[in-house]
Amino acid sequence: MSNSIFSKIANAVGGKKGRLITLAIWILLVIALQLFLPKAADYKDDAAPDLAASEPSVVAQKVMDEQFPSGEGTPALITWYRSTGLTNADLAQIQQFSKELEQNPIKHQKTAVPYDKMPLPVLKQQVSEDGTTFIQTVLMDSSATSDQLKDSFTELEKTANATFSDKPFKQDVASKDTLVARTTGPAGISVDATELFSDADVSLLIGTVLLVLVFLLVIYRSPILALIPLIAVGFAYLAVTPILGLLGQEGIITYGSQGLSIMTVLLFGAGTDYCLFLIARFRSQLHHDENRYTAFKKAFGNTAGAIALSGFTVMAALLILLVAKYGSIHNFAVPFSLSILIMMISSLTLVPALLGIFGRISFWPFVPRTEAMAKEHATKKGKKVKIHRENRFWHRVGEISAHHPIKTFVITLLILGGCALFATQVKYTYDTLSTFPKDMPSREGFTLISDHFGAGQLAPMNLIVKTNGEKTAMRENLQKTDGIETVSVGVPSTKNRDYTMYTIQLTDNPYSNAAMDLIPDIRDTAQTTMSDAGLSKNNVWIAGQTATQYDSRAVTKDDEALIIPLVIGLIALLLLAYLRSITAMVYLVATVLLSFFSALGLGWVIIHYIMGTEAIAGLIPIYAFVFIVALGEDYNIFMISSIWKKSRELPLREAIAEGVGQTGGVITSAGLILAGTFAVLTTLPIQLLVQFGLITAIGVLLDTFIVRPFLVPAITMLFGKWAFWPGKGHNQEHK
């Protein structure tokens, strides 16, 4: 896009007339969107399936629901515990509570085991061996949302409070000789997961706004300027959320609380960056031009192209998530890319309008002036003239990289490579419970079950086979499989007796990798048993949480294998189109990839060795990769484009020093703010977001302080004129 076009855009959005019109359009647009479109929060769907209907565990669940309707429903496991042992009075009250649930079911309750009809000796047989724990099963409607289940469990606790005098759901698990109750199982876990993200939204928004405000005040020391990016981001947020609400209402897209939380961070982090690139250039230009509109035109012309390319790069990379088969990843694509698009438009229209309105006053009390204006101002005030001097720190950093490229390259490569080596040691988990705080009710309930019964009892899996009435050695063969605790007697379907279901309890945590690794063995055993009986081995289905987690792991790994090359390819093509250099495209992509693996490795050191976490969430690599690579390439684009422009008039060595010097301050500020916004995620009680925020923040910081000022300039210097190949946008002297 030519400078004349940028000049026209600058006039249209930031000129004397255009600035007020642009601001008015934004205000009217946001008001209209807020008044006439639904809120995004009203149409978030935290119960949206992550797996496609064709996945084996989903097919198995459908077969189970059709053939064994009595088992249809989401289990809520009410765990009763007394450290000194459950008393007869406790069990009698549990029976009374069971009777209450049977006579007055809570909302969305399907069935509840009638423990009140069991003789006390029979009931005692279901208590744990140490006599401390009892599990009461209530099946909830599988179509109920997490919010509906939350209301149901609130009602359940009220019923319990009327039955038990000491309010067992409110008691601390560590209490001595006190009856304690917790709701866990798939239903309880679902409710806690949703509540965690719901509680995170407000605190995340407030924390992010405060952090960005503090950073801006420290960097620019101007209250007006600190508010301009926040206003731009705020308007973008108010515009994007109702649009998402409309798309959700119409069923065009699906999104959840997790996506909205990360979108908030993305808007404030990336959005503030885009604003800063323009603001910093505008401030610099005001030291050379008396007319603020002339200064703005030049600043806009020098940054708008890079901002637009940066925005489109991130947006396109995020849209690639649409190819993901795993629901949570796929559902990020539209909210994230739409937020970046609107934020980019805001930074190129609303920010110029605000700068046009406030002009130099934007930077009060440290107003940038030309030398002549500074002398005139000092004379009026009777003060000594303060001539503006550019900060030379980043220029000196650029000189180090340009004058000592080999040393710089080797040192930075050793630092980043050393961190990246730890990425090979990372262990992953797909255990939903491990992402919860230890004091969450469902996790406390699971811990009680695991400690006193066995982890496998939390979520047994179900094996369904179609035997056509033939006898098989299924139960006997399954019991021989390592990792299986118990296998129930086969239960024929009440709808079609050709179908038989076996309930399998594992020795391991059903959400663990060890449990998931058993799925192929169980399937092979079942299929072999069917074949030995002369039956089709295709009529074998495995349902349950472990089977679902197994499919989730497989699908996310497939998504990683597809999305990562696509993102790399896309960014490479965009860089090639913008820089017209194959060489630069290759080493810029390579450096950002190195940033990602270094961040993953260093993040693992902190998470595993310092925080004591055994494994990180399995979704972290793909989450962090897209953000670190896409956002990290932003800084390379801004810096390398500056070097490219300087190299047309200066020798490459000087162009590198000038390019790093010119962009160093603003990129550092932007990097700190972006890393800070992602670091806000580490304050949340959700390990998935803590780990994602930490690793992404590390990646941004590595890119800001090592890759961009040292590694990339050093590589550019080492390549010399070949850094531009096959383009020729450089001076003939490269010394």
Give names to the regions the model predicted:
Residues 54-72, 84-179, 425-615:
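Structured non-transmembrane domains adjacent to transmembrane bundles in polytopic membrane proteins
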Residues 47-48, 85, 328, 383-385, ...:
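Short, contiguous strand/loop micro-motifs
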Residues 76-81:
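Acidic/histidine-rich, surface-exposed loop or edge segments in extracytoplasmic proteins
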Residues 27-29, 39, 45, 50-53, ...:
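N-terminal cofactor/phosphate-binding cores enriched in small/glycine residues
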Residues 1-42, 148-426, 547-735:
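Membrane-embedded transmembrane helical bundles of large multi-pass transporters/channels
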